[in-house]
């Protein structure tokens, strides 16, 4: 009898051990290898897309964008706009709580927008919210936002990933340190942030959408080296990696356990020319440089085919984008124009890049060689984030050393104003925003301003087209390509993908 009991105990112990092992094995933990580090977990104070993308683990906005860049409701159920375009009334979902137990309601929305629109807080994304005059909590599920002047793209500001809802209790508790203590309504909550190595998030048990999230944890791990990032997928150290270096794409595609994804993007790559400085103040010089670049060849050499030549200054999937006939490659025409402009022997200049990764280096080298063929000697410099902030974003027109500048822009609102105004409006020269061409045209300024005062889609189309027509003709840029976004993931990971603005969508992610 004693022996029988002993055997039963052993059987029970074996079953328990097996169950524990099974549970441990079944833990759904995902590692995501990304290309750079995170600056902050406060979306309102982050200028980089990656930090805002990771912050979506904890945070949600009132509205968002789907994979087709169409508006969708998130924490909001609906909205209305007054006839004069000044007042936005937003109805909120009921019964949602922040991860610290605080109710999500109209008062929480007010706390966030009051903080964002107060210049005294010196938040990096203040320019998105500076047109808010006041935010009122009408009742627990109704918010009224009054603008200083009509701004028809305002709903797209609420779509922007910066417009996240942070627990007002956490804002009060942590103040300026909120970037280290994220508390939102999202599917995951912070587990660990090792600022030099990784951010780990864990499932939020109180998440408001039934059955989600399906993963137990996500570890966001910065891996600067392209080859290491790709290797981590092959060894199983990571289940998702972005960006995938183009030179590694073909190799990963052959791996039966990995799926390679090339998705559309709104990431436009271009070279701005400082039109306030010689020789770029001459339209013929700018035209010549556009003829000097072989864009189809650039797509092959620098992007391994994962891009398309630019057909405008706004990517095609952005609302109100206009497409034009691409600049043909014509070095003979380029040399003729340079001669007409007074530079028969070309000139010397500088070409800076906002990034120093391998693709940027290839673009710089290719462009340098192309310009040399028409007599232009370009000294190239690939900058890191610190150099870019100091030398480009932090200096005004008089002290700026920018001449030619290779960079990119992703209009995360999905609407043409954010694709045009920060880059071409006269008031947005650095250090205000990112008009690194120091371009100024009163007609363009007027068209962009008028487009924000109307809610009539036909009128907005007319005004944005008029602005883009002028910009395309005056050529303060060399528009290069619109990138495709290349990511890769383990085939047993589903529901995890890259959005066109280079953010991540992972709410439905699961390990099979």
UniProtKB/Swiss-Prot annotation:
UniProt keyword terms in alphabetical order: Periplasm, Signal, Transport
Gene Ontology molecular function: peptide transmembrane transporter activity
SUPFAM superfamilies, alphabetized: Periplasmic binding protein-like II
Domain of life: Bacteria
Name of the gene encoding the protein in the UniProt record: gsiB
UniProt key word Transport: yes
Protein name: Glutathione-binding protein GsiB
Pfam family membership, one: SBP_bac_5
Subcellular location: Periplasm
Subcellular location, principal: periplasm
Organism lineage string: Bacteria, Pseudomonadati, Pseudomonadota, Gammaproteobacteria, Enterobacterales
